[in-house]
């Protein structure tokens, strides 16, 4: 029997606010254990949560980016469960009135297949702390993460392959990233994903029994976990067995999912309205204010790059892969620089440097101003492309002006024939055999002489001018 795969994803996104959702403690990643905490995070008796308005702002922006309806009157709920990293013994979340509902997002697979994935809801909640089990037999609780604001985005079970799930995550990350409400970095925990997977015979409308898969810390691991889980369930069903509703953990070393616990239902959490957080009324004016603050989406930017700037689809996708690079590009072309040249540098030398240094664009000295200044120096013949690579490294490491560095370092390209001719004659004198070979009909000998000329000028000779002069002198020598 053949089965159809049914996948739904629950994605937690950490919001980039300066303080937590209900306390003034910092949300900064890292730091010593329990250093970014407040009495509210510790749940000391008598303390009350105070809502961070910036979290509501971020929730509205996310809902708009995901084409969702917005609950204009909403409240928070208590989700009750006991665990050491949850000192209140309940989590403040949203149950029946999430901030966003009834949304959708477009996905595209590598083969060009497109689909619309519906999004059931997006609700705001606080994160829990973190447990660490030491080798000394003790367990330790770090509450730095306790109270960090999250938005949980729950898709409908519209995905039919692990590849579609991967494409959905890619599109979702891009949409959230361009709102500016989160950096969506899975490696730092600011984006986490749980998957619900079930199988059903083709043609059957009812869903099969689902399992939830956790502990997937990258998009590729999500795909690997889904591949394994689909195969595991299919094997059980074909053998006449039954699937249990359970929660499983992905082991990235073995590529397998492992049983964690029998799945709880929503009733186990005993949701009820949070009495200490008031109901919020979201006006149309508030929503429009957030809509107007949203930057151009990645999709709109790609269309602009292709239709208005003449870039290829590949270039447009590379530039919009991260908002930081796209923003940098948009600023750079304001200086009347050829968009294609800026694109080439960002995808070439800049990307290679960032990868090798394991840094992001804002962490180096390169700016839209000094990059475009350097490109102009290449275009007007002041420096060669080879010298430009040296200039770029200087700008990346230390910032500053490209033009000032070129002058200070003596890197200005030699284009004056009166300066080049004596050097050419000196090269001929030191390489008489190559000159004789060229005059004897060996054309490649001239290339060797050009190489010697560039070496003699430490790469500063204008290649076009130097090569033209050298051939003229060879023919007249």
UniProtKB/Swiss-Prot annotation:
Group of enzyme by EC: ligase
EC numbers, comma separated: 6.3.5.-
SUPFAM superfamilies named in the record: GatB/YqeY motif, Glutamine synthetase/guanido kinase
Quaternary structure annotation from Swiss-Prot or TrEMBL: Heterotrimer of A, B and C subunits.
Gene3D superfamilies xrefs: 1.10.10.410, GatB domain, N-terminal subdomain
Gene expressing this chain: gatB
GO biological process annotation, one example: glutaminyl-tRNAGln biosynthesis via transamidation
The protein's name: Aspartyl/glutamyl-tRNA(Asn/Gln) amidotransferase subunit B
GO function term, MF aspect, one: glutaminyl-tRNA synthase (glutamine-hydrolyzing) activity
Keywords: ATP-binding, Ligase, Nucleotide-binding, Protein biosynthesis
Pfam entry (one): GatB_Yqey
Cited InterPro entries: Asn/Gln-tRNA_amidoTrfase_suB/E, Asn/Gln-tRNA_Trfase_suB/E_cat, Asn/Gln_amidotransferase, Asn/Gln_tRNA_amidoTrase-B-like, GatB, GatB_C_1, GatB_Yqey_C_2, Gln-tRNA_amidoTrfase_suB_CS
Catalytic activity: L-glutamyl-tRNA(Gln) + L-glutamine + ATP + H2O = L-glutaminyl-tRNA(Gln) + L-glutamate + ADP + phosphate + H(+); L-aspartyl-tRNA(Asn) + L-glutamine + ATP + H2O = L-asparaginyl-tRNA(Asn) + L-glutamate + ADP + phosphate + 2 H(+)
Function per UniProt: Allows the formation of correctly charged Asn-tRNA(Asn) or Gln-tRNA(Gln) through the transamidation of misacylated Asp-tRNA(Asn) or Glu-tRNA(Gln) in organisms which lack either or both of asparaginyl-tRNA or glutaminyl-tRNA synthetases. The reaction takes place in the presence of glutamine and ATP through an activated phospho-Asp-tRNA(Asn) or phospho-Glu-tRNA(Gln).
């Amino acid at each position: 029997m053949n089965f159809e795969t049914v996948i739904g994803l629950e994605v937690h996104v950490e919001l980039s606010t300066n303080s937590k959702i209900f306390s003034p403690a910092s949300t900064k990643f890292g730091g010593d254990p329990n250093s970014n905490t407040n009495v509210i995070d510790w749940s000391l008796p008598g303390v009350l949560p105070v809502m961070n308005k910036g979290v509501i702002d971020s929730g509205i922006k996310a809902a708009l980016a995901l084409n969702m309806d917005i609950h204009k009157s909403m409240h928070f709920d208590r989700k009750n469960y006991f665990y050491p990293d949850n000192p209140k013994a309940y989590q403040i979340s949203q149950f029946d009135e999430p901030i966003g509902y009834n949304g959708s997002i477009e996905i595209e697979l590598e083969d060009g297949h497109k689909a619309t994935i519906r999004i059931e809801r997006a609700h705001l909640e606080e994160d829990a702390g973190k447990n660490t089990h030491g080798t000394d037999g003790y367990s330790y609780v770090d509450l730095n993460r306790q109270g960090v604001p999250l938005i949980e985005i729950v898709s409908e079970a519209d995905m039919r392959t692990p590849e579609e799930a991967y494409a959905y995550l890619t599109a979702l990350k891009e949409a959230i990233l361009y709102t500016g409400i989160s950096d969506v970095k899975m490696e730092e925990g600011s984006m986490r994903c749980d998957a619900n997977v079930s199988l059903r015979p083709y043609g059957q409308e009812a869903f099969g029994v689902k399992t939830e898969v956790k502990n997937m810390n990258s998009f590729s691991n999500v795909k690997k976990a889904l591949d394994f889980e689909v195969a595991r369930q299919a094997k059980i069903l074909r053998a006449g067995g039954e699937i249990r509703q359970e929660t499983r953990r992905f082991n990235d070393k073995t590529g397998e999912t492992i049983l964690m616990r029998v799945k709880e239902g929503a009733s186990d959490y005993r949701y009820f309205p949070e009495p200490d957080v008031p109901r919020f009324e979201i006006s149309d004016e508030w929503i429009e204010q957030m809509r107007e603050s949203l930057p151009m989406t990645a999709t709109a930017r790609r269309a602009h790059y292709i239709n208005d700037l003449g870039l290829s689809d590949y270039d447009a996708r590379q530039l919009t892969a991260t908002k930081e690079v796209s923003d940098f590009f948009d600023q750079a072309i304001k200086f009347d620089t050829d968009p294609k040249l800026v694109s080439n540098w960002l995808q070439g030398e800049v990307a290679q440097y960032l990868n090798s240094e394991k840094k992001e664009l804002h962490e180096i000295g390169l700016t839209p101003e000094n990059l475009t200044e350097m490109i102009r120096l290449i275009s007007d013949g002041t420096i060669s492309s080879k010298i430009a690579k040296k200039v770029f490294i200087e700008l990346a490491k230390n910032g500053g002006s490209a033009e000032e560095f070129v002058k200070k370092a003596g890197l200005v390209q030699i284009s004056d024939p009166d300066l080049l001719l004596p050097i050419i004659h000196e090269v001929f004198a030191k390489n008489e055999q190559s000159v004789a070979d060229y005059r004897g009909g060996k054309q490649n000998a001239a290339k060797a002489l050009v190489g010697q000329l560039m070496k003699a000028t430490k790469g500063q000779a204008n290649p076009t001018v130097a090569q033209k002069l050298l051939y003229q002198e060879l023919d007249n020598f």
